[in-house]
């Protein structure tokens, strides 16, 4: 296993070890090495106190009460945490008090799942033969059997940090593992504890689920665990809401369609996949029936965009991520019409934003396949995408793309800066948008004289 550890992490490890302290690689890095998966963070644990670690690493920093020291290495941070025991979790997130532990076994006892409670100790000779795994909870067996199991008492672990409820789902999703029966039953019983967790922490775990190859299965697991009822209850409202209409491809209820749209959305961006999952979230709110008694969802895209905005704010998405999700949902019902003019194509691009075109097409593919259509793209959609590509090359999508600007107007018409300049530019832009050949300086300067009369 030592061959899998990068040299910079080994240097840090050896420095602590050479100062006569115990030190171990621990947690996700050991788990992923055993799984032969990429390792992101090379976390360590030691019996050295934070003060002792700061003496070993003068450039390290320590600004928390949980014993974690950050050591900067090649633009990365390697975290080293002192052995600790924890008492009381009144906020279901952080321990009320922390005491330094004496042994690695004490430290491993406070961790969440058995597969994360394995420590790796290296001998001073850097020999792979003498690398020792400390595994008091048989985490290696659970890795082999693909099982997620809480360390010790599941109820105690989840009450210590309620995010572990969601983390169990996330790890099971990422590695396609099964959650052990006692652990699963406790998740079902304690699902409401997730309300104690901040939206930001929930969002991080949720996006990791959506980024997984098994995102579809992960969302279904969230539903089965009751966690989805508290994380995104708006999705649950779609259960049992029929969409069947004569001549329409929808055969599933709204919830199932949303989840299938996520499954078939070709984007690998978890933010776009979240938009696919939420794209019809407005349907339950606007559902009604027409004069024939058939179900309709008039303006569901508008209602859905408003609901998605609230969800994103609750989960502390960045403004940029939220606006993208809302935009995609608001306009996902765009019509693919082969008779649409080039100017109409350009208006569509401006409406959704050039940066959102590919994401909108991915959402449409997910929507189609998630609704039971057998082909990802109709001939109309393929033609529409081709026409969009053609218009993205030469088209002026804003006033700034015109062949003249405000300075040209001031110079040509000999007027002072003011609102009139913006009005003139807008008129010129609308004219050019209908006929791109007019976007040349000679023509536009001539039109200036006509517009100023």
List where the protein language model places each region.
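Catalytic cores of the polymerase beta-like nucleotidyltransferase superfamily
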Residues: 1-453
């Amino acid at each position: 296993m030592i061959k899998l550890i990068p040299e910079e992490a080994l240097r840090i490890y050896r420095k602590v070890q050479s100062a006569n302290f115990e030190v171990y690689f621990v947690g996700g890095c050991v788990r992923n090495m055993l799984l032969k998966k990429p390792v992101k963070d090379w976390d360590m644990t030691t019996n050295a106190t934070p003060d002792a670690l700061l003496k070993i690493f003068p450039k390290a920093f320590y600004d928390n009460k949980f014993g974690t020291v950050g050591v900067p290495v090649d633009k990365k941070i390697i975290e080293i945490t002192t052995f600790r025991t924890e008492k009381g979790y009144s906020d279901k997130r952080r321990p009320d008090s922390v005491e330094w532990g004496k042994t690695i076994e004490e430290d491993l006892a406070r961790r969440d799942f058995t597969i994360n409670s394995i420590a790796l100790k290296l001998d001073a000779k850097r020999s792979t033969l003498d690398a020792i795994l400390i595994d008091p909870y048989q985490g290696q067996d659970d890795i082999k059997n693909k099982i997620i199991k809480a360390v010790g008492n599941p109820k105690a672990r989840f009450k210590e940090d309620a995010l572990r409820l969601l983390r169990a789902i996330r790890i099971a999703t990422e590695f396609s593992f099964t959650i052990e029966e006692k652990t699963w039953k406790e998740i079902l019983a304690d699902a409401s504890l997730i309300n104690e967790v901040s939206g930001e922490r929930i969002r991080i775990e949720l996006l990791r689920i959506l980024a997984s190859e098994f995102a579809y299965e992960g969302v279904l697991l969230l539903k089965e665990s009751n966690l989805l009822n508290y994380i995104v209850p708006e999705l649950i409202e779609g259960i049992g809401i029929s969409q069947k209409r004569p001549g329409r491809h929808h055969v599933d209820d709204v919830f199932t369609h949303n989840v299938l749209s996520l499954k078939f959305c070709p984007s690998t961006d978890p933010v776009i996949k979240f938009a696919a999952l939420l794209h019809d979230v407005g349907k339950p709110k606007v559902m009604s029936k027409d004069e024939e008694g058939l179900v309709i969802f008039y303006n569901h895209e508008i209602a859905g965009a408003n609901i998605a905005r609230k969800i994103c704010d609750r989960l502390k998405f960045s403004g940029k991520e939220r606006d993208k999700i809302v935009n995609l949902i608001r306009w996902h019902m765009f019509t693919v019409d082969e008779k649409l003019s080039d100017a109409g194509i350009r208006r569509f691009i401006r409406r959704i934003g050039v940066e959102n075109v590919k994401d909108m097409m991915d959402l449409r593919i997910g929507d189609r396949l998630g609704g039971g259509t057998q082909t990802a793209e109709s001939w109309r959609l393929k033609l529409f995408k081709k026409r969009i590509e053609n218009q993205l090359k030469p088209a002026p999508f804003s006033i700034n793309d015109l062949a003249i600007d405000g300075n040209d107007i001031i110079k040509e018409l000999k007027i002072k800066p003011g609102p009139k300049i913006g009005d003139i530019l807008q008129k010129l832009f609308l004219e050019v948008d209908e006929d791109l050949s007019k976007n040349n300086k000679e023509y536009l300067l001539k039109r200036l004289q006509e517009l100023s009369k």
